[in-house]
Amino acid sequence: MHISDDEFERAIEQVLDDLPERFARVLENVGIVVTDEPNERELATMSNPCGELLGLYEGIPVTKRTTGYSGVMPDVITLFKGPHERVCSTQAELRQRIRKTVLHEIGHFFGFDDEYLHSHGY
């Protein structure tokens, strides 16, 4: 399933636009990056190396920040377009997968681990 770069980015923007204001406000300093494929370093973060890496949160979750949290680079959520295209067979499925991935990575920002996110459908 192929989607243009613009369509992929619009799908991400739609998920972010649909977030409740109280969550969106907290995410203002989180960068969202889109790239075609994960690199070796990013792939090394996978707990299941047999699957596709759809997204990656890099930063300090809000639950781990202390009063001394300052002067650090912004957190980044990276979404990988190629893996999304490979695991989906329809436009609707692709848009749903993008939504699920964005919300999954935002979950990491809020301190939830993979086990928790997967058990709740993300």
At which residue positions do the language-model features occur?
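Short alpha-helical catalytic segment bearing the HExxH-like zincin motif
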Residues: 97-105
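Active-site rim/adjacent substrate-binding subdomains
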Residues: 1-97, 109, 115-118
